[in-house]
Amino acid sequence: MDEKNLPVKKAEKGIIMQRYTDYDETTVRMIQPVHDELTYCGRIDHSDPDAPVFVQPGSFVRMSFTGSSWVRAVVMNHRSYNDSWVGVLSDRNQYRVKIEKDEEPVVLTLAENLERDTTHEITLFKRMDQCHTYVFLGFLVEYGARVEKARPLPRKKIEFYGDSVTAGEVSEAQNYAGMPDPPSEGEYNNAYFSYAWATARRLHAAVHLVAQGGIALRDGTGYYENGTRGMESCFDRIYFSGEKSGEPRWNFARYTPHVVVVAIGQNDAWPEDIMKNDYYGEQAQQWREHYKAFLCRLRENYPHAWIVLTTTILNHYPGWDRSIGKVCAEIRDPKTVHFLYQENGRGTPGHVRASEAMQMALELSGFIEGLAPDVWD
């Protein structure tokens, strides 16, 4: 792994502007983030087009090129916890690369020993949730390489709101399928193997994952940020925490999904499992009212989308799913539906592994395809 320094200059309003210049222009070509032929997907902070910040899991940038035997990426990582890994798809081969340093530019070798006279496709994607974010400063290829128009995103669009299961946390610990999680520092986390991204691939759809490990619906519950931040106050943000958690807000006009999947209602049992303790009690009713209000806010942003309400196969008390079904019936929205997996709430005590996620994707994609003939219109 090559690591080089990056000149950094401060711009107005305290915004940090990064430009990578430490390379030999006689042998290396820099592909800037604003290059017309790059394809982006995901809830990415493009406030500075020359230095987009990858925040949400599954976000990616894709490039097609010829004339280079290798390709590298320049990133600047900000780590909150866990080790930091990026995901790579090189001509459809999927693997990971570790970011060894934080708060300084790092050059990551994404692929090498490529045939120069062949067109290659490279995708740099965010494997993990907001345990880290990174600034993308461009690709490096051999001098004389040609960038070609990248494969376009599918016409179909889907979006997921969820927690660690939706983000693909610990999905690569395949030897622990159906078991509690092994000790790890994030090396098993991979959004590519989440049921969410797998569902999108089965449907041949573009996907946005708005997901964070530990998050619940309501502020003051769940594990994320010690329970201070819930999805109800984060769903319209790019960043869920830190100095940028308030701004910039996400512009919903940038991505209009045909289908929205809401998979919240598992971490909500912490610090108290209110559905198990008293399903008809005041706290449980308050949760259902907050859930209903959240759905109304989603509907305001997506007036024509199908909204699928669900949880996952991660073990949890079934009262949460009954509450979701109750809200679904009460709102009387013909395009808001409730879905349960075959092993819903009882499939595993640990996070969902890749094989389990593939089964979930099979069930969910089949359900979505059966919603209506015009689901993708």
Task: Name what the model sees in each region.
Residues 73-76, 161-162, 210, 263, ...:
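Short hydrophobic segments within beta-strands
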Residues 304-331:
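C-terminal hydrophobic structural anchor segments
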Residues 340-345:
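Short glycine-rich catalytic loops that host catalytic nucleophiles or stabilize transition states
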Residues 291-295, 325:
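Generic structural signal for well-ordered alpha-helices
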Residues 278-285, 348-351:
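The substrate-binding groove and active-site-proximal loops of carbohydrate-active enzymes
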Residues 56-58, 181-280, 306, 314-319, ...:
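Conserved SGNH/GDSL esterase-like catalytic core that processes O-acyl groups on lipids
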